[in-house]
Amino acid sequence: MTTSFWRIATDARTYEADDLSGAGAKITGGRWNEVGVAIVYAASSRALACLETVVHLNSGGLPLNRYLVEIEVPDEVLASAEVATPGNLPVGWDAEPAGRVSISFGSQWAQSQRTALLLVPSVIVPEETNLLINPAHPDAKGIKARKVRKWLYDPRMIRKA
């Protein structure tokens, strides 16, 4: 059996939206990883995936080349995931913009190779869960991704300045 997680991603020149190599985050860094560390970000629901991406959009227009991607995680891999909660994360994990605390935490997790998955709280809605996938971990090979459909943001989500 598998459990589904979700991401909204784009086809880039060097990788597709359903790529699980962590190439995008490796190039840009993110809340939970420094530049050079590959991690795949996903959300526990489609709505959270939308929210996690829309906060990065500005009034310059809505991106058009996005896809809803389903990530299927084998239940045995999910059962061995490391779980971080607001109560066991270091103070400052939720700083905005992302700071050293969360970036170091996630990067150290990925480099340690302890688990293929790290469940973390959403900064936007801490009661909700995001999933980090370490593509370098051997258990990540059983995780599958597929483009479900084109993703279009509702224009009401972005206010023009």
UniProtKB/Swiss-Prot annotation:
Changing residue 41 to A: No change in toxicity. Its EC number is 2.4.2.-. InterPro entries: RES_dom. Belongs to the MbcT/ParT/Res family. Homodimer, forms heterotetrameric ParS(2)-ParT(2) complexes. Disulfide bonds: none annotated. It comes from the Bacteria. Consumes NAD(+) and auto-ADP-ribosylates on the tryptic fragment Ala-47-Arg-66 in vitro. Also auto-ADP-ribosylates using NADP(+). Forms salt bridges between the 2 toxin molecules mediated by Glu-127 Glu-128 on one subunit and Arg-46 Arg-149 on the other. This is Prs ADP-ribosylating toxin. SMART domains: RES (SM00953). GO terms for molecular function: glycosyltransferase activity; nucleotidyltransferase activity. Toxic component of a type II toxin-antitoxin (TA) system. Expression in E.coli inhibits cell growth; bacteriostasis is neutralized by expression of cognate antitoxin ParS. ADP-ribosylates E.coli ribose-phosphate pyrophosphokinase (RPPK, prs) using NAD(+) in vitro; ADP-ribosylates RPPK on 'Lys-182' and 'Ser-202'. Cannot use NADP(+). Also auto-ADP-ribosylates in vitro; in the presence of RPPK auto-ADP-ribosylation decreases. Signal peptide: none annotated. The lineage of its organism: Bacteria, Pseudomonadati, Pseudomonadota, Alphaproteobacteria, Sphingomonadales. Changing residue 122 to A: No change in toxicity. It holds the Pfam family RES. Keywords: ADP-ribosylation, Glycosyltransferase, NAD, Nucleotidyltransferase, Toxin-antitoxin system, Transferase.
